[in-house]
Amino acid sequence: MKRVLYPGTFDPITLGHVDVISKAARLFDEVVVGVAAQTPKETLFELEERMELVERTLKHFSFSNAIALPYTGLTVDFAKELNCCAIIRGLRAVSDFETEFQLALMNRRLKPEIETLFLMPEDNHIYLSSSLVKEISRLGGEISAFVPTVVMEALKQKIGKRNSNPVAISRPR
């Protein structure tokens, strides 16, 4: 059985992530969506909340061969522990490649038997990032085209509804 790991913070999971999971699920027998407990980024959602959002998203999109698991430590060690043949990474733009390439080389050095495979999302998801989605949500923008419904609802609860014009801006005369 060919099992792969798709790791990330998923704070929150977006339709871009779903797109990559869909591609991986078609190519491999099992996709483990690894939700990182430790991250250098400050997260909006706690690990348990991120896990729930990922699990509900996998169920909503009927990914019968994908599961979500939390993990700590090195991603490549987690992949080895799960007997994964590869780590899946999504590439949105050339700017992603340099960082992902360095990570892939380091992972290869640590565990040469674990490959890193890059998958590109569809054009309509290539610009998506969790950070942008959170910022748009904070500013009261419409995010339904970027995230699953369960995530949109969770963001509204977490961030709260804001006025469309929360700050009056005065212009110099």
From Swiss-Prot:
Reversibly transfers an adenylyl group from ATP to 4'-phosphopantetheine, yielding dephospho-CoA (dPCoA) and pyrophosphate. Homohexamer. Its cofactor is Mg(2+). Its EC number is 2.7.7.3. InterPro entries: Cyt_trans-like (IPR004821), PPAT (IPR001980), Rossmann-like_a/b/a_fold (IPR014729). Pfam families: CTP_transf_like (PF01467). GO terms for cellular component: cytoplasm. Pathway: Cofactor biosynthesis; coenzyme A biosynthesis; CoA from (R)-pantothenate: step 4/5. One of its GO terms (molecular function) is ATP binding. One of its GO terms (biological process) is coenzyme A biosynthetic process. It is found in: Cytoplasm. It catalyses: (R)-4'-phosphopantetheine + ATP + H(+) = 3'-dephospho-CoA + diphosphate. Substrate binds at residues 9, 41, 75, 89. NCBIfam families: coaD_prev_kdtB (TIGR01510), cyt_tran_rel (TIGR00125). ATP binds at residues 9-10, 17, 90-92, 100, 125-131. Transmembrane segments: none annotated. Belongs to the bacterial CoaD family. The record marks 17 as: Transition state stabilizer. It comes from the Bacteria. Gene3D superfamilies: HUPs. This is Phosphopantetheine adenylyltransferase. Its main location: cytoplasm. Keywords: ATP-binding, Coenzyme A biosynthesis, Cytoplasm, Magnesium, Nucleotide-binding, Nucleotidyltransferase, Transferase. The keyword Manganese does not apply.
